[in-house]
Amino acid sequence: MEIIRGAPALSTFRVQKLMEACVSAALPVRQIYAEYVHLADLSELLKPTEREQLEKILTYGPAIEAHTPQGSLLFVTPRPGTISPWSSKATDIAHNCGLGKVKRLERGIAYYVESDTLTAEQQRTLQGLLHDRMVEVVLNDFAKADVLFKRTEPAPFKSVNVLAEGRRALEVANVEMGLALAEDEIDYLVENFVRLNRNPNDIELMMFAQANSEHCRHKIFNADWTIDGKAQPKSLFKMIKNTFEVTPDHVLSAYKDNAAVMEGSVAGRFFPDPNGVYSYHTEPMHVLMKVETHNHPTAISPYPGAATGSGGEIRDEGATGRGSKPKAGLTGFSVSNLKIPGFVQPWEGNYGKPDRIVSALDIMTEGPLGGAAFNNEFGRPALLGYFRTYEQEVSSHNGVEMRGYHKPIMLAGGLGNIREEHVQKGEITVGAKLIVLGGPAMNIGLGGGAASSMASGQSSEDLDFASVQRENPEMERRCQEVIDRCWQLGDKNPIQFIHDVGAGGLSNAFPELVNDGDRGGIFNLRNVPSDEPGMSPLEIWCNESQERYVLSVAAEDLPLFTAICERERAPFAVVGEAIQEQHLTLADSHFDNNPIDLPLEVLLGKAPKMSRNVVSAKAVSPALEQSQIDVKDAVKRVLSLPTVADKTFLITIGDRTVTGLVNRDQMVGPWQVPVADCAVTAASFDTYAGEAMSLGERTPLALLDFGASARMAVAESIMNIAGADIGSFKRIKLSANWMSAAGHPGEDAGLYEAVKAVGEELCPELSLTIPVGKDSMSMKTAWQQDGVNKTVTSPMSLVITAFGVVQDIRNTVTPELRSDKGETSLLLVDLGAGQNRLGGSCLAQVYGELGDVAPDLDDAALLRGFFETMQKLVANKLVIAYHDRSDGGLFTTLVEMAFAGNIGLDIDVEDLQGTDLERLFNEELGAVLQVSRDNAAKIAAQFAIAGVPCHVIGTLADDQCITIKDGAREIFSDTRVALRTVWSETTYRMQAMRDNPACALEEFKLKQDETDLGLTVNLSFDPSEDVAAPYILKGAAPKMAILREQGVNSHVEMAAAFDRAGFESRDVHMSDILSGRISLEEFQGLVACGGFSYGDVLGAGEGWAKSILFNERARNEFSRFFERDSSFALGVCNGCQMLSNLKEIIPGSEHWPRFVRNRSERFEARFSLVEVQQSPSLFFQGMAGSRMPIAVSHGEGHAEFASAQALALAEASGTIALRFVNGKGEIATQYPQNPNGSPNGLTGICTTDGRVTLMMPHPERVFRTVANSWHPDNWGEDSPWMRMFRNARVNLG
């Protein structure tokens, strides 16, 4: 084992945060220094030149001054017996650089701690701050790290002696293994194994437990129900299916696959043909939809819990039909009170929590980062979300009890597209190869399905930790590229049948695969790729290692499938073969036995059906006491409630522009305020048709009225999507995610009431279908604290996601108020018809109360009338701005619209009934519309004809004040900036705690700056002029290499941009160049695309660059290309980072910087303002002086020069092509206008001859006007960024 010292691991402010954590934990620590240490497992000693090469490969990241280590060593490494994602990718890079003697690279962090003598307890506390015990260990000596490379002998399976010891043996195994088997399931297993005359093996029991867990089988939703002694006619699932029976319109697949599918629009699907050339394929773009929850793992370990939640949902989408394409994602969180240090709110008590779960604050610090990071690295934009905090002592049908989300909701969902011929799964032919595609088996996530089916507190702490999985999104990206290549082959798609590997691992996935295909299977355990040779058969078969799919491929198609996987560097293995008989055999060649030998009907057959005999209950709660509440205090409290407050800290960490197909993300208007009601995507690059999705959830209402909570969730999802141009209810499909504390008194009957309200009544009445959903039935946390039994039980929680097919994405209306549209009026459409019920409202919550009566949708006809009227107005472009009324009531709706439009309001609520508090803070269904004053009366009349009350409530103000009156009496008045400051303080506090606090403060101050102009545009050219048109007419299209490496994710939109400019865009993978399949000699131009090559493990783009510099064939190819006078190249984002590391082979690049970690030390997804500089760049000719917004999505975009002198030389060279600026056109020096902290706002640079240009922002994602989060009204189809690509075509003549 070679030990190679690396760079410092922590920046100054990260060290400071760690020291603050030590102070909080009362640890006598004086100083901590941390640096990376690399470990190399070698097959033989390296020559001096090879050692030097390895050291160069392992030199990466920002330049931080190294120290001479002092103090005690705590060396944090991956857990022995595992291979970290970092290791597998870094080892890949070493091999691609020709270092075959390196068997494996691994990395740890050496912490040097200077302190007083620590007690054993203090040592444990300190180690807890420095490592994640789920996947890491702490060593006190570098030499001990050689245990990472030790191989252990496989362990055999164990049998449970049912034949001799009977039922008791299985009862003991049930507890020890955490199987969560019900009594009747134990009887079923004993009976079946006695009949088979053999003892069950541990692996068979775990497989049965996973396949039959509540998580996988949905026993409660399929159960028979008796309520208050009366047998109910339908199961919960039957009531959900009723929506499809009543309205099957436009549904192509429901209830039987990994996701549901609805009819989409016809568009030109853009992808490469088998020859690698990208082109449009006009066909139906059907829409798949899926929403999952990952609650249990997120409570235990939020980052990996949320990451693998998103990853698993993405796999569900990709494994729909015979393979499909995930497109856009959503994330949601419900947690208990945050209790932010130094910012604890008056309604936040201190009830406590069990040690084995983390706090709500931890969840909201780490969980969103995990979900965002997975989506970012996979390359799926995260466009939608919700965030609710709730933890309150309430009077319920069980007396006074604590309700809240100690067991959180972590929602992960999204939509994608699928080809018509692949919607239905194919036939698994006898003899077909049964394949696992993706990463290796690791001893993690054991029993996740069964564990998440228990109430938190029933399983042991170690089992809780064992049930969390780990993430490797770059591996999942590679697998998705394989699936993409397969579905792109149309009727030659080699995939017959595909499932993702989720709960239960292969033990659930392979039986499900063969059973769904009416086949059996013979499998070989030792063919499963494994990173931990010491695992037992149970651990290999049942672990929940992520990023895996199982599929069947006909034997004759195996060579084609193999070639695709090898090109994409996606690992796969043939594990078994399909057989006619529905029997499952798992052979173990190592021990020469069969750990599994079972008829499938025993595993998946007639396990006993559940019966629920329950009693209903009704809560009685007093009305909200209003007399002591001051309106000004209510405003401050409601705007500070995280459910209502600014959610920027959850949004800018997630890429919202990848794919180039995003029309509407969370951020709205020139000031990019996060208040959008729905997300909208384009179907493709050649159409205005698209897709929309929105969320609806009103969970606290369930504490008063289960049915109302469910109806309001459905209604809110419709109110949120109403601003998109959909047309008909029948083009909207819903996902329903149900969370409940099953078994808690009153909750089961309440769940039944809620499902019935939606499935049997509301949805059928509105022609709405629920073709997909998920349930999580153990939403309760129980523990003992100082001898006292404590519980926190969540409200019955229904989260609805609405998915719609959009007719014209240009018609989408946002909450941005416009002051440049002449005289306008604000209308309140009130579906609550003046009832003003305050039960379960945010107002009640912030005063520690629940209230008495919940708002409700009293008549479905109100919602139908509203939606149909609104859709006509949207299609005819009669609505200027739109925002629904929900959490925080009318007051919140109005101020959020004012924030988005950067303007004041004059509001008069004289026409509305009720007290001031009721009028401003009731959360009845409703919406505010900004319309032309000339049209206001006509529009109000249209709503009246539809049976929906509508009131004119005000206008835009001439100043920046928000004033609310009741006739002549003033109810409330304050400045927009003062209110924005209150609304944004929660996000500031969270950012300051999690990220660089200096950056967080700069952003908070910018929100308070009345002189901030937001995004502005100033162009030096006409974007509607196609300067490339004369050259395109000449005929032959020049060849453009669209270059990608494993983990790159922005290549399709890049190909589309160059295709539109008249190039022949060709898909080129680095494996094509390394293997000699393709030579760069063939191409006039090359573009290195954005993403996460090798997961950025050796610095962003650096691993990719080194695999070129240190590979003889690749180095020669690229050197020859750059030396050609006629060639040109563009590097964007990850491609920019990569090319900046190829300076030694690119002529004229001497002044280039490296691109390293952002100043905020956070991935930054922003819509930022840049100005084109005067430079020789061929891409920017004729564009100098132009100022316009552009998509930014990177974690390592800070331009780092070797010295101040090097920066001065770069400036003097005239090669700086692009800078971040503010709305006044001044160089942006402050965050977030300068999102990465680069000196002088530098974010683009070129060679001295202008042939090679690097830029961190993404022009390819915004080359269409509709793909810009905000744009001036007068832009046409092409945004100004299209000029860049056309300039490249002009340059070739």
Curated annotation (Swiss-Prot):
EC id: 6.3.5.3
Compartment(s): Cytoplasm
GO cellular component: cytoplasm
The keyword Nucleotide-binding is assigned to this record: yes
InterPro entries: Class_I_gatase-like, FGAR-AT_N, FGAR-AT_PurM_N-like, PurL_large, PurL_linker, PurM-like_C_dom, PurM-like_C_sf, PurM-like_N_sf
Keywords, sorted A to Z: ATP-binding, Cytoplasm, Glutamine amidotransferase, Ligase, Magnesium, Metal-binding, Nucleotide-binding, Purine biosynthesis
Enzyme class (EC, first level): ligase
Stretches assigned to the Glutamine amidotransferase type-1 domain: 1040-1293
Chain spans, region Disordered: 305-327
Domain of life, per lineage: Bacteria
Similarity annotation: In the N-terminal section; belongs to the FGAMS family.
Protein name, per record: Phosphoribosylformylglycinamidine synthase
Taxonomic placement: Bacteria, Pseudomonadati, Pseudomonadota, Gammaproteobacteria, Alteromonadales
